[in-house]
Amino acid sequence: MLMPKRVKHRKQMKGRMTGAACRRIEISYGEFALQATECGWVDSRQIEAARIAMTRYIKRGGKIWIRMFPDKPLTAKPAETRMGKGKGSPDSWVCVVKPGMVLYEMEGVTEEIAREAFRLAAHKLPISTKFITRGTQNEG
């Protein structure tokens, strides 16, 4: 699973997810991409599950790029612990996703195969997404 090698601060504040993405909004590597249409947190396990679903469908053809990285730590307190006594220890890592952000890219396969592979991957993610191609990435 994806996670940072080392971080400056072990714990982060929750933050607010407002506005659309202004970076990572264009297709950089592949021919087809999966783009987020709503904001949310995507866990490192969900990123990996979507990657596995895509690679199993396209088999040995094509190349996949993961354009998101889980760099935000989520903390959790142990079960059956009373409130207070500080913030919990880091538990998992998430990627903050905003609308318009490109999540995955793919090339080397036909559009039908890419569309179906991204559909399978989208079922593993907690946010709504859409399929875009290199020519139609800035429409609506």
UniProtKB/Swiss-Prot annotation:
Keywords: Ribonucleoprotein, Ribosomal protein, RNA-binding, rRNA-binding, tRNA-binding. InterPro entries: Ribosomal_uL16, Ribosomal_uL16_bact-type, Ribosomal_uL16_CS, Ribosomal_uL16_dom, Ribosomal_uL16_sf. Pfam families: Ribosomal_L16 (PF00252). GO terms for biological process: translation. The keyword Ribonucleoprotein applies. GO terms for cellular component: cytosolic large ribosomal subunit. PANTHER family: 50S/60S RIBOSOMAL PROTEIN L16 (PTHR12220), LARGE RIBOSOMAL SUBUNIT PROTEIN UL16M (PTHR12220:SF13). Part of the 50S ribosomal subunit. Binds 23S rRNA and is also seen to make contacts with the A and possibly P site tRNAs. Belongs to the universal ribosomal protein uL16 family. This is Large ribosomal subunit protein uL16. The lineage of its organism: Bacteria, Pseudomonadati, Thermodesulfobacteriota, Desulfuromonadia, Geobacterales.
